[in-house]
Amino acid sequence: MNDYQQYIAKSRYARYIDDLQRRETWEETVKRYVDFFSTKYSNFPSIELYNGIVTLNVMPSMRALMTAGVALDRDNVAGFNCSYVSIDDPRAFDEVLYILMCGTGVGFTVERQEVVKLPAVPEELFETETTICVRDSKIGWATSFRELISLLYSGRIPKLDTSKLRPAGARLK
């Protein structure tokens, strides 16, 4: 690999290994990818594919290369490069947030025939005693956002409790 390829591999695809206090090598990144899919498919061509990827003769889904392991096992959305949604229901907003937090791009439409399906926005909003507790996870953020949008559409402004969030600058889990 040339310097540019090494930089991209290390900065975009290599996972940090806590025990070793370093990022994966290119070979370790490819091994993580191949091992992940080998456990999913019994006839997966592990050795042949590993050799092809390591030598840059074969390129897998780079999103899957980036997320193979716990993240991709937890949610297959992390393996997609892009997605699409019509903004025609309030649920679309938290779905977009969740998909983006999984690292997948989201295209969307706000064409008139779609957005007219959204509820009317109230003319006035009123503060309430309702508190939304934001949990420190992708689903926690998306759920909280869904609650917020729902309350705003009903004319209510809730309080937000962000005390469960990790400190600014802390590593993502």
Q: What is each PLM-predicted segment?
A:
Residues 1-173:
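Extended catalytic cores of very large enzyme megasubunits
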